[in-house]
């Protein structure tokens, strides 16, 4: 087998690896959907799921139209790409890279949905997604990942211009702790500040009422994200080489120790394992290690994961203290842990692997510049645009719709619980005991309806039995009145019904005398 054949085979293996990793990253979308739906209240879970599906479609379309060109097109002074719009090419490496990067832009967008859940309009969220994926993310991506990143992955592909200005400085973010996760976190922060907290979230009367609909679903989503993250970090290498095993083990260890750190902190602070910390811990570890998973050893990855979890939990508590309502903890996990992961590159990475030619202190400064630049651009642009948009088109749903739940208000998605409430309301107003609620052994509302119907069956039977005896007693009383009238025809005893009505005292005497008269007649 000659060198050319080996080279083609190697390229094909690399392409297959990146495609498989892109599929794994796509699966992360399902993980986000499960996690965010599980952490949202039941009345909003369908809305959250639909947003996760819709933002993926919007993200891919925007990336195809504008994003890829802005991010990887010929650079204008390292700030923005100027071509490759309406992406089209016959080069398989470019095609593969487009698919992989399209998964990344969808991830950045879906981070936002969880933070603003339960009160942002569906159409408003799609507008936010367009802004994030067509403008903010691609421009920032160009600064750090532009054509030089592509040429690093595929050395035989012609580059399209100079590198982004952050790349020229030596900024390193291997798989996107800042470029993907912090960008999504900054936009999410702008969104929640403009929207404000959910109605009653920080009222003492509602303490404990804002819990997720299903922690098992949320934890399942966390595990799916963990699984997909192997593709997220592994595919960023761009090739199936000796670096991949290190990337995967660092990814796994950071997440595992993040999880254990979350459990440990929950035992220390709450004396019990908190399911929310089980969600925050591994995800924070994964976000933190994303920037340096190819350039640190396993011990460093463990430290990065542990500190990432601690920072995420502290940030989560600070948000609660300042009444910044982030439904799923997107800001602590993706923004705070992402910043830490980017800083950790300068602290723990092997400088030879980084290949920037900078000292550790110089690398630290460059990483800081990158974090600040990305933060200012992402937050400022998103906050200004959303603030202006909110003045013309309110992004938040009405209080009535928020209380009702976005499943019904925005999608007309009627649940078993809503059907049961409607039945109870109709029954209370009509008094009809024959009305029955919805039954479904696979939903909470349906199970309640099943037992409610059993109770109503017994109540209806009891009511029928009561009516039966009431009618029988009434007939017996009528018969007794007829008998007495035959003995005392001049007296109208129907004026004195014996159906629980109290007679005046003088009437008792008349009835008693009539009774004595009847006995005397029978005796004679």
What kind of region is each of these model predictions?
Residues 1-427, 433-451, 455-456:
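Hydrophobic alpha-helical transmembrane bundles of multi-pass membrane proteins
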Residues 455-463:
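Signal-transmission/dimerization alpha-helices at domain junctions
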Residues 422-426, 433-444, 462-524:
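… and, occasionally, acidic/histidine-rich disordered N-termini of signaling adaptors
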């Amino acid at each position: 087998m000659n060198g050319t054949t080996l080279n083609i085979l190697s390229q094909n293996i690399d392409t297959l690896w990146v495609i498989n990793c892109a599929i794994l990253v796509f699966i992360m979308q399902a993980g986000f959907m499960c996690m965010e739906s599980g952490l949202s209240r039941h009345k909003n879970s369908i809305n959250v799921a639909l947003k996760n599906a819709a933002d993926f479609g919007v993200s891919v379309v925007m990336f195809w139209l504008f994003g890829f060109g802005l991010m990887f097109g010929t650079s204008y002074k390292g700030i923005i790409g100027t071509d490759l719009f309406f992406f089209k090419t016959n080069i398989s490496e470019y095609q593969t890279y487009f698919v992989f990067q399209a998964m990344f832009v969808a991830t950045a967008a879906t981070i936002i949905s969880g933070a603003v859940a339960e009160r942002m309009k569906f159409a408003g969220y799609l507008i936010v997604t367009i802004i994030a994926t067509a403008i903010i993310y691609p421009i920032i991506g160009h600064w750090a990942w532009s054509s030089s990143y592509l040429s690093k992955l595929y050395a035989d592909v012609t580059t399209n211009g100079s590198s982004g200005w952050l790349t020229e400085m030596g900024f390193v973010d291997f798989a996107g702790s800042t470029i993907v996760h912090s960008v999504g976190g900054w936009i999410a922060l702008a969104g929640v500040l403009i929207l404000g907290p959910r109605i009653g979230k920080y009222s003492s009367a509602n303490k404990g009422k804002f819990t997720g609909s299903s922690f098992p679903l949320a934890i399942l989503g966390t595990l799916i994200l963990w699984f997909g993250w192997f593709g997220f970090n592994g595919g960023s290498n761009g090739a199936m080489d000796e670096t991949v095993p290190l990337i995967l083990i660092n990814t796994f260890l950071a997440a595992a120790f993040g999880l254990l750190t979350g459990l440990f902190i929950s035992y220390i602070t709450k004396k019990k394992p908190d399911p929310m910390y089980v969600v925050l811990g591994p995800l924070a570890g994964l976000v933190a290690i994303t920037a340096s998973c190819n350039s640190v050893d396993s011990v460093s990855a463990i430290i990065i994961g542990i500190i990432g979890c601690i920072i995420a939990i502290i940030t989560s508590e600070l948000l609660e203290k300042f009444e910044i309502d982030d439904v799923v903890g997107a800001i602590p996990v993706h923004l705070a842990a992402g910043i830490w992961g980017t800083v950790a590159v300068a602290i723990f990475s092997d400088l030879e692997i980084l290949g920037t030619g900078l000292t550790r202190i110089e690398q630290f400064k460059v990483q800081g510049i990158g974090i600040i630049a990305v933060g200012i651009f992402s937050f400022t642009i998103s906050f200004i645009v959303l603030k202006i948009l909110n003045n013309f088109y309110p992004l938040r749903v009405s209080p009535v719709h928020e209380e009702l739940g976005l499943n019904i208000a925005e999608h007309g998605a009627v649940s078993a619980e809503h059907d049961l409430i409607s039945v109870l309301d109709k029954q209370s107003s009509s008094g009809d005991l024959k009305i029955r609620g919805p039954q479904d052994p696979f939903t909470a509302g349906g199970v309640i309806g099943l037992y409610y119907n059993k109770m109503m069956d017994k109540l209806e039977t009891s009511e029928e039995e009561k009516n039966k005896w009431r009618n029988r007693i009434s007939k017996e009383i009528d018969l007794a009145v007829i008998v007495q009238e035959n003995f005392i025809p001049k007296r109208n005893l129907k004026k004195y019904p014996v159906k629980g009505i109290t007679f005046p005292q003088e009437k008792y005497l008349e009835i008693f005398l009539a009774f004595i008269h009847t006995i005397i007649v029978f005796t004679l």
